[in-house]
Amino acid sequence: MWRASNEARLKGSAPPEHDPRVRGHLENPSAFLFVADDAGVVRGMAVGMQGLADDGAGPPIEGLCHVGAVFVAPDRWGDGLGGSLVDAVLEEAQTRGYTSAQLWTPADNARAHRLYTRRGFRRTGRQKRDDLGETIAHYERAL
């Protein structure tokens, strides 16, 4: 799913170097995953997990949920599926006792920026380059 979504967004092939990052999200012991399927075909996914200090390299930050691996099939872009998946992650995060949420998304992905700001996320002004050299922007919100 993530590969099809990224290939459409990047208008080319999604780098295989992203595979370990997505797998890492899914294998994280604190992770909770939501999947949207249509007759057994995955159409979208989103993951929530314990947020960590130092941009994911440090110790857990109490009360912080990291939202990651939000991917939607390109033919479902704009129909609300991504928002429903993010809403499900945020609702589950609250149920688990998280009090805030954060995420990183490509700085040039206007569709993602609209999705997250509609759900109460605000850009913090922090940006960095990910391990593949793409500029990503940080967002957060209270739960």
Model-identified regions with their sequence ranges:
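C-terminal "cap" of GNAT-fold acetyltransferases
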Residues: 34, 63, 99-102, 106-113, ...
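Conserved glycine-rich acetyl-CoA-binding loop
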Residues: 73-87, 94-96, 107-114, 118-119
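Surface-exposed, flexible loop/turn segments at secondary-structure boundaries
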Residues: 53-54, 78, 109, 129
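Local beta-strand/beta-hairpin segments that build beta-sheet-rich folds
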Residues: 43, 124-125
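Short C-terminal domain-edge/linker segments immediately following a structured domain
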Residues: 19, 32, 66, 77-81, ...
